[in-house]
Amino acid sequence: MRFLRRLGSPALLALGLGLGLACGDEAPRTTRGPVPGGDPERGRQVITESACGVCHTIPGVRGARGLVGPPLTKFGRRSFIAGHLPNTPDNLVLWVLHPQQIDPRTAMPSLRLDEGQARDVAAYLYQLD
């Protein structure tokens, strides 16, 4: 208690404001930029051919109204991929390539895509805003 008294009111106010800002509900979200080497149109085709819409709702993909996985709308504005990976292009490519290795409890199957296809998928998902 003596320590708090020595800090004084201005220091306590600054500390409280800093903690309040750090504990906010959402981190600032920004739309991710283009994925190096990724083509959004090819990504849409890969998503269609891989039947991602069986599990996910995906704007712009015919019949993609799945309810098993999360909807992939506004993907670039999300802070995390699969609830725990920071949402970066490289992390998304890794997730698309190896979901079971990253999270053994995930329901997402291995799609057996190559890195170029995963980059294309990431490019498509990041332009969904």
Annotated model-derived regions:
Residues C52-C55:
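Short cysteine clusters
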Residues L19-A22:
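C-terminal motif of bacterial Sec signal peptides marking the signal peptidase cleavage site
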Residues G37, Q45, G63-D129:
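Extracytoplasmic electron-transfer domains, predominantly the class I c-type cytochrome c fold
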Residues E26, I58-P59:
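Cys/His-rich metal-chelating microdomains
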Residues G24-T48:
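Electrostatic cytochrome c docking/interface patches
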Residues M1-L12:
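Bacterial N-terminal signal peptides that target proteins for export
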